[in-house]
Amino acid sequence: MWLILFMIVIGAVIGGVTNSLAIKMLFRPYSEKRIGRFRLPFTPGLIPKRHDELATQLGRMVVSYLVTSVGIGKKLTEASFTDSVTEWAKRESRKFLSSDQSLSSILHQNFQVEDSEKLVLQQVERWLETSYDRWFREANSRTIGMALPEVIVEKVERNLPAIRRMLLTKARDYVASDQGKAQLSVMIDRFLETHGTLGNMVSMFFSNERLVDKLHPELLKFLNDQETEKWLQKLLDNEWERLKEKPLADIQQYVEKEAVVRIGRQVLQTQVPVIQWLGKPLHAWTGPYEEKVAEEWVPKLVHVTIQLLVSQLDHMLERLHLEEIVREQVSAFSVERLEELVLSISRKEFKMITYLGALLGGGIGLVQSLIILLIK
């Protein structure tokens, strides 16, 4: 009986100590041990020995199975996540738009801009100068007709008959008026004075008043003639076609860069409210837009941003080099800290493994003692 009990105790001790030692040898010793030139077996422990390999494998596992573009994309497009981000963005936008700060102070605090109005004007002037140079540089191979929007070309051509009618109406009204008749008399006098002998001969036979009385009805008749309308319409059409065929570069001499920049600056200062908004509190001028921004623009912006992120996830994760980050972090993690972490999580399980070893050892001791008794 004592033999059986002794063998059970010895087996249990051996089994428990063996399993406990095996668990310890997962982490210890932390470094290689030597006696002279000879390295002791099983040093360092399993995890310290495979630390770098473990870091590499963890990096691969994280990239391949844990942090993937598919998983992140699925999370980003979940309705709950999208709704929470949208609500947060709405709150922040309302908070920003109702702020007492001005655009000038925000630019100064966040971007160290001392004179925001001067900066805006400088940027607009630079943009106008660049656009002017680029537009006329590209104009070398283009005509006015090519540069004009099609809607403008169509509108001009559609209104040419109206322009013709307006010109003829104005001309008829002017010629038929007393002012027009007086101007005709002046023109006849000027004509006779500048044509020497011919003018003197005409003056001998016809007085100025008589010439006006003769020419005035004929001029009105000419202006009311349908052929005159056709002639004027053809003239307008031809001039319009000639204008469209002119190179864009031809108009550069009439449009100076300095004038364009000056007019743009004046319009910005007097007509565009941004300049006036710069020094005012945000809530003073954003009130009419707050609801539209928060309820319409922000949700659309959130949706577009999330879709853009999802479409670029593969590229972003590749550029982040997550595998390398995980490998470096795990490699930098001390084995002592790793041991504490694993034991804090699995201490109960490791104890059960030790007890299981003792139980198996005790069972083996019992079997051995019974075999010995049978042999005797």
Curated annotation (Swiss-Prot):
The keyword Cell membrane applies. Pfam families: DUF445. Keywords: Cell membrane, Membrane, Transmembrane, Transmembrane helix. It is found in: Cell membrane. One of its GO terms (cellular component) is plasma membrane. It is a multi-pass membrane protein. InterPro entries: DUF445, UCP032178. It comes from the Bacteria. Belongs to the UPF0754 family. This is UPF0754 membrane protein BH1148. It comes from Halalkalibacterium halodurans (strain ATCC BAA-125 / DSM 18197 / FERM 7344 / JCM 9153 / C-125) (Bacillus halodurans).
